[in-house]
Amino acid sequence: PLARTALYGLGEDLHVAVWPGGEHNTRDITRFIAQEARSYVVSVSGLMRKEDFPTDTPHLPRILENAPPILANGGSCIAGPDGQWVVEPIVNQEGVFTATLDFNKVLEERQNFDPVGHYSRPDVTELMVNRKRQSVVTLKNDGSSIN
């Protein structure tokens, strides 16, 4: 929730979510995030079928022997700032879709609820975000740090 709050605080009007693949991820979460943020959410989700595996994949027969024809059914979609579908999840097929988004709806919905407006009580709480690039590994040699 805090990472999302940081994005909301930056004034995000369009959020792009990338999922490994499956309507089970996109159907509920996309609408929830859109309604919570009062922004548009585009969820992009992968489609994986048996025939999509390269033929030189190690142990391919073993991987696919009990697999269903579709391993990840996609589910790419767009939800509006009110949580309603602009484009419902597209499953079991590849495709490209487009939509025209009315960003005035974002402002209208934020009149109803603004997640980082006065409801967030900035007089009581504060979220600090460290935007400095972080290193995954810090090497230490004789007590000093080397990044």
How would you name each of these model-derived features?
Residues 93-113:
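A short, polar/charged loop-to-alpha-helix boundary motif
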Residues 49, 99, 121-123:
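Serine/threonine-rich low-complexity intrinsically disordered regions
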Residues 1-97:
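CN hydrolase (nitrilase-like) catalytic-core segments centered on the catalytic cysteine
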Residues 22, 26, 53, 60, ...:
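A sequence-level detector of short, solvent-exposed, charge-rich linear segments
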Residues 106-147:
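Cysteine/selenocysteine-centered motifs that mediate thiol-based redox chemistry or coordinate metal-sulfur cofactors
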